[in-house]
Each structure stands twice: as structure tokens, then as C-alpha cells.
A protein has these predicted regions:
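… and, occasionally, acidic/histidine-rich disordered N-termini of signaling adaptors
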Residues: 3-197, 252-269
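C-terminal catalytic subdomain
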Residues: 5, 132, 186-198, 203-269
Length: 269
């Protein structure tokens, strides 16, 4: 499987370190790619496979912010291909406008209002978009997160050796549905070795040749079995590739019907 390296000029980056909670984009893209990054107290790995094209509707972004804080965003625009790719790029532009909002729920609220108003004014209607965003404090190990109708992230507890779903009760609307939506956030404490796995719904809705959907539960089990069979210490890039291969194996030999993006974080130390 080949991945295209995303050059820095593909997306314009904005440095805002002079402002409170100033964030600098380290990487963002909606193209086929595999990228690993080191942040304050955190490892990050992103692997993305658009369906039927080199770019699609999944946008992933990683920011380094002040106070040893890292921010990650994964957005999934309805559909795939050229139109969804344009929507993903629009979401990316909005991220730069609001990237310095510290609160994850506040970030989603601002994104949603602007996105919805833009959709109402645009001759080409923007599509509904799900988003998950999180901030990790490298000093305390606290991970704050919020959803806009996005699939639940998975939390790997290294000590217990199992994955858990994150965000019970966070039932918020996607971007573009209605202005004024109030989003909620939760937090979890990460210990060294703990991981966060965010993904687009293409990873859970993939169907076998017989028509059986992998489902969120099946994806969780696949993630656990994938991690169990990799020799330790597990490298995040190896885990991402092996998990993606597992998703593709469920699909069979045919191409994936939807964009698939996996964004994995692990607390270091």
C-alpha cells in the first residue's frame, strides 16, 4: 500500500504562539498519508486512506500549543471524493480561525456556528461533518475531548491491557445542522503507555463480501487482537498499519467504500 507524503505547502500553517494558548499546526491533511509526530509527553500517528481518490472527506490535524499542550482534530465530512475533499479543506480553514480556543467544547461550538452559516450562504451546500477534538496536557497527563456526532474514540489502558470506549453521554450534533448547538466535553487521565485511538466511521462501517458490517464492537476487538499479536515494545506506526490491514481484510480484496483515517496517540514516559 503506497502513501503520498504531504508537503508543507499543501496547507497553509498559522503560528499564533504570541497569543494565549497559541497553537501552531504541525501537520494537517485530507490526502493519502502516513505520518508520525513527537509532542510534549505524547506520540502521535496518523494513517489515512481516501476511497477512490488521493484526497477525501477525512481531515486530521495536529497542533502544538502553549503550556506543553497538544491538540488533535479528526473531522469526517459526509461522502467521499472531490466534493467531500472541498468540505474538508473548508473545515481546515475554519480550524485556523478558531485554533486558539482552549476549551474543546467551545472550539466545536465556534466551528459549528461558522460552518452552518457558511453552508446557508453558499451556493454549493456544505455537507454535515462529524468531528472529534482533544487536548493533551503533557505536564499533567490530562486528555480533554469533545464530540460533534463522531464515533467514540477508544482508550487503551496499558495496565489493564484492554480498550474502552470514551465519551458515554456525549450525544452532540454534527457541524452544519443548526447554529447555537452547545457541546460538552469530558476528560480522562492518561498514564504512560495508555493510548487514544480516534477513527472515522469508514473503519467501523466497512462490510465483508457477505455484507456483514465490522461495527464499533468488532473494530474494538480488532484493535485489541492487532495490538496483542505485535511484538513489544509496539511502535505506533506498526500498529496503525496492522490495524488498517485488518480493516481491509474484513472488506476483502475490493477497494474500501469510504475514507478511513486512524489517529493514534500514546502517552510517553
Amino acid at each position: 500500500m503506497k502513501f503520498k507524503k504531504i508537503e508543507p505547502e499543501v496547507f497553509a500553517c498559522t503560528t499564533s504562539a504570541a497569543r494565549p494558548f497559541g497553537c501552531m499546526e504541525l501537520w494537517a491533511g485530507n490526502e493519502r498519508a502516513h505520518r508520525s509526530l513527537e509532542l510534549a509527553g505524547l506520540e502521535a500517528d496518523v494513517i489515512a486512506v481516501p476511497s477512490g481518490a488521493e484526497s477525501g472527506g477525512d481531515l486530521s490535524a495536529v497542533f502544538s500549543c502553549s503550556d506543553s499542550i497538544a491538540r488533535v482534530v479528526l473531522a469526517d465530512c459526509v461522502g467521499h471524493g472531490y466534493v467531500a475533499s472541498g468540505v474538508a479543506r473548508h473545515v481546515h480553514r475554519l480550524l485556523h480561525k478558531f485554533q486558539d480556543i482552549r476549551n474543546t467544547a467551545g472550539l466545536l461550538a465556534s466551528l459549528n456556528d461558522e460552518f452552518t452559516l457558511d453552508s446557508e450562504e453558499s451556493s454549493d451546500a456544505l455537507r454535515l461533518t462529524t468531528v472529534v477534538t482533544g487536548t493533551f496536557d503533557g505536564g499533567t497527563g490530562e486528555f480533554n475531548f469533545a464530540y460533534a456526532a463522531h464515533p467514540r474514540m477508544l482508550l487503551w489502558r496499558a495496565r489493564e491491557g484492554k480498550f474502552l470506549e470514551l465519551g458515554e453521554g456525549l450525544e452532540n450534533l454534527p457541524l452544519g445542522f443548526v447554529t447555537g448547538e452547545m457541546y460538552s466535553e469530558q476528560s480522562v487521565q492518561l498514564r504512560p503507555g495508555d493510548m487514544i485511538l480516534a477513527f472515522s466511521d469508514g473503519a467501523t462501517e466497512v462490510q465483508s463480501p457477505g455484507g456483514d458490517q465490522l461495527t464499533p464492537r468488532g473494530f474494538l476487538q480488532l484493535a485489541e487482537s492487532t495490538l496483542a499479536r505485535l511484538p513489544g515494545p509496539v511502535r505506533l506506526p506498526d500498529f496503525s498499519v496492522a490495524l488498517l490491514e485488518g480493516v481491509q481484510s474484513h472488506k476483502g480484496n475490493s477497494e474500501l467504500d469510504d475514507d478511513v483515517t486512524l489517529l493514534t496517540l500514546r502517552r510517553s514516559g
